[in-house]
C-alpha cells in the first residue's frame, strides 16, 4: 500500500509517517519507483505509535520497542509492559508533584488573605 492509504488507515499524516521512518520507528519502506510501499505490520506500528503518543509517550521512548518489533518480526509484549509500568510510575510522580503544588498555592492564598485582611494593608 502507498503512504496515502497507510495514512488513511491509521489517521496519521503522510508527513508524520515519513517522520516515523526517519526516526527509525518504521523501517525504511520498500520502493516502487518514487513511491513508498507499506505492509500490514506498518499499519499496526503506526496505530501503536499514535496511541502511545496519545497517552504520553514520546517518540524517542518508543524507539527500542519499534526496533525490536521489526528485528524479531513480533511485538515485544514484555518490553511494552515495562515501558507502560515506567510511564505509569512517572504519572504517579507527576500527580504527587501537582498535589504539592496545589497545596503550596492554597498556602500562598491563605497567607495573602491573612496578610491583607488581618493587617488591612491596601492592595
Q: Predicted segments — roles?
A:
Residues 34-40:
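Minor-groove-contacting beta-hairpin "wing" of winged helix-turn-helix DNA-binding domains
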Residues 6, 13-16:
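Short glycine/proline-centered loop/turn elements that form peptide/ligand docking sites
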Residues 17-18, 49:
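Short, hydrophobic-biased segments on the C-terminal half of alpha helices
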Residues 26-33:
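Beta-hairpin "wing" of winged helix-turn-helix
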Residues 20, 33-34, 65:
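Residue-level "edge-of-site" marker
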Residues 7, 21:
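The alpha-helix within a helix-turn-helix
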Residues 2-5, 27, 40-123:
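Arg/Lys-rich, alpha-helical DNA-contact motif
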Amino acid at each position: 500500500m502507498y503512504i496515502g492509504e497507510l495514512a488513511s488507515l491509521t489517521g496519521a499524516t503522510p508527513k508524520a509517517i515519513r517522520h516515523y521512518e526517519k526516526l527509525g520507528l518504521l523501517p525504511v519502506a520498500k520502493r516502487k519507483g518514487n513511491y513508498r510501499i507499506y505492509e500490514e505490520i506498518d499499519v499496526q506500528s503506526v496505530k501503536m505509535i499514535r496511541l502511545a503518543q496519545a497517552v504520553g509517550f514520546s517518540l524517542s521512548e518508543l524507539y527500542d520497542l519499534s526496533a525490536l518489533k521489526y528485528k524479531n518480526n513480533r511485538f515485544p509484549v514484555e518490553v511494552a509492559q515495562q515501558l507502560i509500568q515506567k510511564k505509569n510510575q512517572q504519572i504517579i510522580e507527576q500527580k504527587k508533584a501537582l498535589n504539592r503544588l496545589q497545596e503550596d498555592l492554597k498556602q500562598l492564598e491563605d497567607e495573602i488573605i491573612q496578610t491583607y485582611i488581618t493587617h488591612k494593608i491596601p492592595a
